[in-house]
Design a protein with these regions (language model features):
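Short, charged, intrinsically disordered terminal tails
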Residues: 4-5, 65-72
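Residues at alpha-helix boundaries and short interhelical turns
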Residues: 17, 21, 54-57, 71
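N-terminal acidic leader/helix
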Residues: 1-30
């Protein structure tokens, strides 16, 4: 893998990780608001989506770690 590609991929992974975490936080905040307004099902699904975003961030973090270690 070329060094330029590795640098770009690392930057993209970092960006996606942070972007997902921001969305997860926002989903959780709005889920709480939805719950307070009686929207229990919507709130539950939003919290589920927040968890899925966190799992995606974990996978992306693992990808970044393998890239930084030079694993094929």
């Amino acid at each position: 893998m070329s060094n330029d590609f590795k640098i770009k991929l690392g930057k993209l992974l970092n960006h996606w990780i942070e972007h997902n975490r921001e969305h997860s936080r926002e989903f959780s905040e709005w889920a709480q608001k939805a719950s307070q307004h009686g929207e229990k099902t919507a709130s539950r699904e939003m919290l589920r989506a927040a968890g899925e975003m966190e799992r995606a961030s974990t996978s992306l973090s693992q990808a970044l770690a393998s890239l930084e270690k030079g694993e094929p």
